[in-house]
Amino acid sequence: MKTSMQSKLDQLTTRLAELNDLLSRENVTADLDQYRKLTREHAEIGPVVEHYAQWRQARADELAAQELLADASMRDFAEDELRGARERMSRLAAELQTMLLPKDPNDERNIFVEIRAGTGGDESALFAGDLLRMYLRYAERQRWQVEMMSESPSDLGGYKEVIVRIAGYGAYSRLKFESGGHRVQRVPATETQGRIHTSACTVAVMPEADEIGEVEINPADLRIDTFRASGAGGQHINKTDSAVRVTHIPTGIVVECQDDRSQHKNKDRALKVLAARIKDKQYHEQHAKEAATRKSLIGSGDRSERIRTYNFPQGRMTDHRINLTLYKLEQIMDGDLDELIAALVSEHQAELLASLGDAE
């Protein structure tokens, strides 16, 4: 283990002891905000310090085994102990290196998932509905909460555009790699000749701002229009102007919400989505310079980048960023995303490790 890494782990061990002391004080537990902040930090570094304690124990076992090597009668036993200790040290050091990787500050946040139909007309809108169901089924498996924020249904089913809010611990860390272009190859229900069509949708996964105030929005920069909510085919749902359209003039970002009968609730939802979109735009602009110097295969989140193909006749899903093909399309479309997400997270961690190595 590198000296710099060991020094960092020693600092975290000291910090954990400080946190244990602070969290036992009444004045700290009385301040809810401070208590929440400290418990979050404790939860983050606790597993790292525990791993480091195991590594130090393995190193102590290694030293003890080396001393036993001098005794001829204990040599076979000592060699087995030495080999086992070194294997544990190597495994724990690799795991610690991954645990010390820079954390994305948005990882534990709730998210907004925005799905837009692209090329392919009605078939693209139907596939947008299939993607929404896939994410909702995954959220259900994680016991996350889902709230419909905005929807624009298509005439034949599916969606021209749909936005949902998914609330759950670590939602962004699990689904952030879904941003990009999703292509589908299948025979549409309306196809009489049995020909395979190709269509596409774009997905944007945006972390929710903790508070709308976290993103600076000048009320003077907003244009808010109200109109009558309508469903698929244009039929009016109610007689009042309950639907809300919010335009952020400096960026040109437009958000519409009409799912609730209350204009106030629709406006509140629209402002939340707007804050997330502005935050997302700032995040990608900030990382554009880094992307220019170091091509990030996984985490770019570029909406125009085709990241995945779903081939229904062959029952396969291919993620083009990591050249991963899985022949379990039915399960994937039913929300079984764990294998795919684990592969993407692993590749992203490998990229981070490589970039840290280059920096050193």
Curated annotation (Swiss-Prot):
Keywords: Cytoplasm, Methylation, Protein biosynthesis
Similarity comment: family membership: Belongs to the prokaryotic/mitochondrial release factor family.
Keyword field contains Cell division: no
SUPFAM superfamilies, A to Z: Release factor
NCBIfam families tied to this protein: prfA, PRK00591.1
Subcellular localization, as worded in the UniProt entry: Cytoplasm
PTM statement from Swiss-Prot or TrEMBL: Methylated by PrmC. Methylation increases the termination efficiency of RF1.
GO cellular component: cytoplasm
The protein's name: Peptide chain release factor 1
UniProt GO molecular function: translation release factor activity, codon specific
Organism, scientific name: Burkholderia thailandensis (strain ATCC 700388 / DSM 13276 / CCUG 48851 / CIP 106301 / E264)
N5-methylglutamine modified-residue sites: 235
Transmembrane segments: none
HAMAP family: Rel_fac_1
Primary residence: cytoplasm
Pfam families xref list: PCRF, RF-1
Classification via PANTHER family: LD18447P
Superkingdom of the source species: Bacteria
InterPro entries: PCRF, Pep_chain_release_fac_I, Pep_chain_release_fac_I_sf, Prokaryotic/Mito_RF, RF-1
Gene3D superfamilies named among the record's database cross-references: 3.30.160.20, 3.30.70.1660, 6.10.140.1950
